[in-house]
Swiss-Prot record:
Keywords from the UniProt entry: Coiled coil, Cytoplasm, Cytoskeleton, TPR repeat
Self-association state and partner proteins as the record states: Directly interacts with tubulin-gamma; this interaction determines centrosomal localization.
Organism: Mus musculus (Mouse)
PROSITE patterns documented for this protein: TPR
GO process terms (BP): cilium assembly; regulation of microtubule cytoskeleton organization
Ranges in coiled-coil conformation: 96-210, 273-335
Main location: cytoplasm
Domains: entry comment: The coiled-coil domains may be important for tubulin-gamma-binding and hence for centrosomal localization.
InterPro entries: CEP70 (IPR037692), TPR_rpt (IPR019734)
A single GO cellular-component term on record: centrosome
Superkingdom of this protein's organism: Eukaryota
Function field: Plays a role in the organization of both preexisting and nascent microtubules in interphase cells. During mitosis, required for the organization and orientation of the mitotic spindle.
TPR repeats (start-end): 502-535
Protein name: Centrosomal protein of 70 kDa
Amino acid sequence: MTEGSQIFLLPISTSDSTKEPLSPVASKAQDPSLLSNRLMIEKQQEEAEWESINGLLMTHGFKPLCLVKGADLRDFIVFDKQSSQKMRQILKTLMEETTRQQSMIRELIETNQQLKSELQLEQNRAAHQEQRANDLQQIMDSVKSKIGELEDESLNRVCQQQNRIKDLQKEYKMLQMKCQQYKKNRMEQEGTIASLQKEIHRLAKEEEERILTQNRVFAHLCRRVPHSVLDKQLLCLIDYYECKLRKLHIQRQFEEDSQSEEKDFTNLGASPNYKGVLMSLQKQLKESKSRIDVLVGEKLSLQKDLENRPTEHELRLYKQQVKKLEKTLKKNIKLQDLIGQKKSDDTEKKDEPSKDSHQQALIEQSYFQVLCSINSIVHNPRAPVIIYKQSKGRAPNGNKDIGQDCGFEHLVPIIEMWVDELTSLKDLYKSLKILSAELVPWHSLKKLDEKEGVKVGDLLFMVDTMLEEVENQKETSSTPNSQTLQAIVSHFQKLFDVQSLNGVFPRMNEVYTRLGEMNNAVRNLQELLELDSSSSLCVVVSTVGKLCEIINKDVSEQVKQVLGPEDLQSIIKKLEEHEEFFPAFQAFANDLLEILEIDDLDAIVPAVKKLKILSY
């Protein structure tokens, strides 16, 4: 094949390249066989190069170029070797550039997807950080509120401590004043104690002198020492007369002093010396002041003695006790005399009847001692006044001689009264039990022990508990009047649009159920949002609003990722195009799936490529 027979079919080309003519000298000089071989080799190389170019074109989806052999040259354009080589180089560079651009586009797509994934991660991280920032903001708000509460509490504590310090300072001042007052009182009491000790010492001396004078007078009169009751009575008489003599002596001294003062006054009136009169008046004033001080001291001591002395009621009781004791002493003396007489008379006759009488006397003595102790309890100053009235008012109906010997008949009505009071304690216990069941039914009372009986302490305890409960109820519960109750009902009707009173209770039940539903919903929201149970409704509403904002932002971002950064009109246009072309594309895709006998859209392109390869 000659150089002129190498024809290439190329798409529309307007090349003006000229053919290189072969010199006749060279063609003649070359050997025809060598020339033909060289041409064949060049032709094969060129065909191989074009085959490689066709392979590149086919890989990029273009139709291959065909080499034409021996045909009419009118429908073809012929290139020389250089232009064909340039064409091959141009096509090769174009294919390489397209592959490079495709790889670059692929890399750009991969980097775009990677950037999208990173952007999604960053957005998720930003949302997480925003949520965390919101949580931290809530924590900071709660901490600020707690800090404010703690500051308020600390301020309140400081104010309370300052007030307490002021109160303590006032109490300290009051205590100091009281301490000073107590010190003054103690000094006064020490002075009074010293004066009283002096007075006691003086009275003790006077008592000793009185006893000595009594004994001396008694020894002078009777020539013996006092040892019996009559001797004591005689000593009392001696003391009585001695006191009268002492009073007369004091009165006589007072009269003598008054007479001497009158004489001084008369002497002063008679003397013409004025200075002497003034001096005597000054002396009299000093003496009168000293006497007034002495009299004031005596008055105070007498007042204290009067305060320390017993009352009239106590004196009566003491006198009665003295009389009873005198009677008991007389009885004891009589019993001792009888026992002594029996011992002296019947020393030889010690038989059983004497022993029985002796035992009976001892038993009577023990009974008498028991009655004396009961009588002392009855006439004790600590005993109630009603017992004294009972013992005084109810006179015995028996013989007067027996009453004078015994003197315990008044104890019988008192003991009867005691028995009646003790039996009435059971009735009082029952009535208090009924009253306690009415007032304080939640208190359980202990059962009454029949062996021990009813005690006054138990009754007092029951009354105290009832009083405490009644006072607590008065303090805690204040019963409203009818006007306030009517105002409450009318206010409820206005709030909840209730026309009649019959509809109040159904509306209250409805409000209660709605309130319960709302509380349950709020509690569920708190659990879902992981909030504290003590958080308010404002916090719940704010957290729900923040969640809605986050969800709306995520939805808008997802729409932007799907549709791209375009405006609303372009999105509407794309949606209209989708509605217009998607049915035809769906029908075409379904037909392809049926023809190719496949189930997935992603498998269409590989199946078509296989068919294309098989067609070649």
